[in-house]
């Protein structure tokens, strides 16, 4: 009888062949788990040992759950939908799929929930594919510096805290200070680019509503429809009535939809309104899952919650198609406290912040942007050269005006230079005011700010500044339209444009009537009072008589 020999090489080859040809099949060995505890949107499930992190689970009634906690003996899952019908003892099955959402151009003009299902009653959405919610952000080599401007249409932002495509710019402030209005204005301002039909100019927009009132979301949708902006916008809605799981997932759903366009070489803008409520929803989920609480009862990974979300906004390299995803996260503060936990986290992640102040808002300065602490760290590289030329001293002038204004409040006597600076500062503040949902094209912003920063408005009463600006822009549009065309064509204020502007504003002042009936171009002599009249009597000039001389006979 021959001796049986086992060769290690043969065993190794057989194992390698088996491993290389093995494909896991969920259907062939279906795992079934059971609910051991359910309540408050959370379910604990025993069994299902092969479950993946962030895998979708299906309960008996068809409701989906998301596996978040993978413990030795049980799974902690957040229920994505109504949880009243889920009870202890019910069976749970794996789907074998990580959470993903449908994406594509079919989402433009639609309102969807965080799972990509339509909420607007307009029928099913035809998707181009699916994209995982948890996806790795672009690496360093896949990015390039921000260099293209994204115009918001708001003068104070485009001039002093410019935003570029691929940037993350935080909008922060107390409630009712106009944070959402700034974001909606930015979306509305993309309409001209959309109507151009040029894919290099077009920006597709996503508005993510997290924990907002249903009436607020409806008002935003109505404003976008009225402005003709809904056709290039998607709304991802997770209202206050939704479970915490939906509020936690909504920003990732919006990012997945936006990243689909970014990786196709297109440009997208996403608004997260607001991430404070997402952090609160994640805190509720984490506490219910019995994760250890940290500062302000938030879990230890709340920074990672926002960093991995906002890092997905990027300007891709040319090799990757050159697409971009610009992020406008919104954070709500309490009592203007920007040093709280979540605000400081997001400030450190983003590329700058626009700080809106309650006092400015209540005093009628809208948008209520505090230019002193608002900053854009990278947007200046993408700013139009013409805007840089006119806005170079704007921030400094406004800062000096605020300082002088506080000093003048004590009733101190000011010299002529300080008074002139106060007068110009008041006109600049008035010039930067802007009605809601009325963004300005960049060429009109340049002309307005040129007039303010070069002293052309110094003789216009403060109460007439906004009317003067509106009428002057209309005058330039009708009589000197070549100025706007030249600014858009060259991107800068050339000497010819400046001379044309000086001529145009001099002509316009000849026709502009102030609120008190004066024409700026006509200088009237001041009327004299009675005391001056007495001293100004006209006297007839009598020349002195010459002395007479007698001739004597000689």
UniProtKB/Swiss-Prot annotation:
Annotated EC: 7.1.2.2
Membrane topology: Peripheral membrane protein
Disordered, as annotated region: 531-554
Record key words, sorted: ATP synthesis, ATP-binding, Cell membrane, CF(1), Hydrogen ion transport, Ion transport, Membrane, Nucleotide-binding, Translocase, Transport
Catalyzed reaction equations: ATP + H2O + 4 H(+)(in) = ADP + phosphate + 5 H(+)(out)
Cell location: Cell membrane
Main location group: membrane
Annotated site (Required for activity): 374
GO molecular-function terms, A-Z: ADP binding; ATP binding; proton-transporting ATP synthase activity, rotational mechanism
CDD domains attached to this UniProt entry: ATP-synt_F1_alpha_C, ATP-synt_F1_alpha_N, F1-ATPase_alpha_CD
Assembly with partners or alone: F-type ATPases have 2 components, CF(1) - the catalytic core - and CF(0) - the membrane proton channel. CF(1) has five subunits: alpha(3), beta(3), gamma(1), delta(1), epsilon(1). CF(0) has three main subunits: a(1), b(2) and c(9-12). The alpha and beta chains form an alternating ring which encloses part of the gamma chain. CF(1) is attached to CF(0) by a central stalk formed by the gamma and epsilon chains, while a peripheral stalk is formed by the delta and b chains.
Function (record text): Produces ATP from ADP in the presence of a proton gradient across the membrane. The alpha chain is a regulatory subunit.
Family per similarity comment: Belongs to the ATPase alpha/beta chains family.
Name used for this protein in its record: ATP synthase subunit alpha
Organism: Acidothermus cellulolyticus (strain ATCC 43068 / DSM 8971 / 11B)
Protein's gene: atpA
